[in-house]
């Protein structure tokens, strides 16, 4: 798998977006959790399964799932992330649908639920993300795999969902 990515996330900082919602372009980094989840997903038999990735960023887990035969919807709030993932899917011959979705406005995801598998990598980097994700996940159905590098408040989240380790820093949640 080969992916295009921005040379520097710092160059993508938009002060007006930050002032509006404290938005920073975390999506532009190739995070170890995303790599770990993509590697794990690449070992799964996903032929014909409906897979949703939340906060996809560069979308490596989505690409891996699509290349394993899944019907994938990758979502992020950042328009630039969505556009770059479209290009990377084409570059890798992967069929990935992409959509801009806020977790606080999840109606498009709920209309398509239940999902067979929900993916997320390093989503709990802010406490407000844990709150929104905690409300959303039980409504999506299916199995959830979450890659988490060990942030302090993520531990409470993982306990809340009776997380079971399935690989290094990858957890299956009981939603």
Predicted segments with their positions:
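S-adenosylmethionine-dependent methyltransferases
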Residues: 1-175
């Amino acid at each position: 798998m080969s992916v295009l990515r921005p040379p520097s996330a710092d160059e993508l900082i938009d002060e007006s977006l930050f002032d509006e919602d404290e938005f920073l372009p975390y999506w532009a980094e190739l995070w170890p959790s995303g790599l770990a989840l993509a590697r794990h997903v690449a070992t799964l038999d996903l032929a014909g399964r409906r897979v949703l990735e939340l906060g996809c960023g560069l979308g490596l887990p989505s690409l891996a799932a699509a290349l394993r035969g899944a019907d994938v919807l990758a979502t992020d709030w950042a328009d630039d992330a969505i556009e770059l993932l479209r290009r990377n899917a084409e570059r890798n011959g992967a069929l990935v649908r992409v959509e801009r979705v806020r977790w606080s406005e999840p109606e498009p995801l709920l209309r398509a639920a239940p999902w067979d598998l929900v993916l997320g990598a390093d989503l709990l980097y802010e406490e407000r993300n844990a709150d929104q994700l905690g409300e959303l996940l039980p409504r999506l159905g299916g199995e959830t795999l979450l890659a988490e590098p060990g942030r302090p408040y993520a531990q409470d989240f993982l306990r809340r969902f009776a997380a079971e380790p399935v690989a290094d820093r990858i957890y299956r949640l009981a939603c």
